[in-house]
Amino acid sequence: MSGLGAILTAMVTPFDAQLRVDEDGTVRLANHLVAHGSDGLVVCGTTGEATTLTDVEHLRVIELVVAELKGRATVVAGVGSNDTRHAVHLTEKATELGADALLHVTPYYNRPNRRGIVRHFEEVAKATDKPIVLYNIPARTGTDMPNDLLAELAQIDNVTAVKQANPDNLAPVDGLELYAGNDDMLADVLDLGGAGGILVASHVVGEQMRRMVDEPDNRRTIDASLQDVYAAMGATTNPIPVKAALNLLGHAVGGLRLPLVEADEHELAIVRRALESHGLLATASA
């Protein structure tokens, strides 16, 4: 298993009724996830609504989770930015706070060319002695990092892994541990000998996804049984469905900050059906 773990949950950021970061809720959720299948947590990533957190909030969430888990599970801090100086700043601060690794997305919106991408990651790598996990998600960033570019980035000393959310690039790259960036890619990544996944559905079916790692002979059967959950988590923009699911299950993670909005009735029904099909709502209300 990777030093970061196999099942890494991309944790939501709980908010209170005024959409302030719920610090107690953050700690509770972190403990719940680690108790239910997660080897580690990725905080302040896409699912954690990092783009609508202030830097103070962002770093506070990292601080809370690192302090709470205290070596019981790994903490990967999402610190990516399309501003290299800002990414360096967040990297330095997250390193000081004790994060085990740093997740860095491809710079988005300004869409740098290949040389710019390499320079960006060279600069952030200089800012830490911790492992860096690259994050390739062209559907959000507008830029794909093909495997030959990933191989070049792997030459940077502390660039050690990639969260791959482009299924067309799903192949091992020398020098990089491979993590599934989508729930429905986990089985394929594990079959390829990859490290695991950075996942959303593990908020609600973490123990089942853990079994996909521990029981390779049953992996495909388990994966097939979870397709409705994966689909529900993608019923609309992440993290809208997973926050809806957690609230239905009694975890009280609150709403979302604009421009994201809460699930509508149709989306909520999809999420509810998936939870009910696995007996999760019955368990939560028992």
Predicted regions mapped to residue ranges:
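Short glycine-enriched loops at secondary-structure junctions
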Residues: 81-84, 183-184, 239
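C-terminal alpha-helical cap/extension of soluble enzyme domains
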Residues: 3, 7-12, 32, 36-38, ...
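Short functional linear motifs
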Residues: 26, 58, 150, 265-268
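Catalytic alpha/beta core domains of metabolic enzymes, predominantly
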Residues: 123-130, 138-236
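Short, acidic Gly/Pro/Ser/Thr-rich loop/turn segments
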Residues: 15-16, 186, 266
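Short secondary-structure transition/capping segments
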Residues: 53-56, 89, 114-117, 145-147, ...
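Active-site beta->alpha loop and helix N-cap motifs at the rims of alpha/beta catalytic domains
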Residues: 2-142, 281
